[in-house]
Amino acid sequence: MNLTPREKDKLLISLAAMVARGRLERGCKLNHPEAIALITDYVVEGARDGRAVADLMEAGAHVITADQCMDGIAAMIHDVQVEATFPDGTKLVTVHHPIR
């Protein structure tokens, strides 16, 4: 399987998000990389499904809550920027204050 660096990054994010979902299901709180991966994966998959940029910017801020993260993680993450592929091309999606 020949993957481009971008495709490898997408797979790594997807795997990290799967790990994060499993930890949430077990009642574990998320660390910084897990929180970022979960939000990023949500945006990438939403773009793949054809959702609008504005919709993903808003919905991305409701993927996880501060209670689902370790102490201090929500304060560390001000914005999450994701370069996602939409049906009409690649766009940058910025989720402001993603953990509330």
From Swiss-Prot:
Biochemical pathway: Nitrogen metabolism; urea degradation; CO(2) and NH(3) from urea (urease route): step 1/1
The answer to whether UniProt assigns keyword Transport to this entry is no
Name the InterPro entries on file. Answer: Urease_gamma, Urease_gamma/gamma-beta_su, Urease_gamma_sf, Urease_subunit
Q: What name is this protein filed under?
A: Urease subunit gamma
Q: Where in the cell is it found?
A: Cytoplasm
Q: Which reaction does it catalyse?
A: urea + 2 H2O + H(+) = hydrogencarbonate + 2 NH4(+)
Protein family:
Belongs to the urease gamma subunit family.
Q: What class of enzyme is it?
A: hydrolase
GO terms for biological process, alphabetical: urea catabolic process
Quaternary assembly: Heterotrimer of UreA (gamma), UreB (beta) and UreC (alpha) subunits. Three heterotrimers associate to form the active enzyme.
Superkingdom to which the source organism belongs:
Bacteria
Under Pfam families, the record lists: Urease_gamma
Single GO cellular component annotation?
cytoplasm
Database matches in CDD domains: Urease_gamma (cd00390)
Documented EC number(s): 3.5.1.5
Q: Which UniProt keywords apply?
A: Cytoplasm, Hydrolase
Which N-terminal residues, if any, form the signal peptide? none
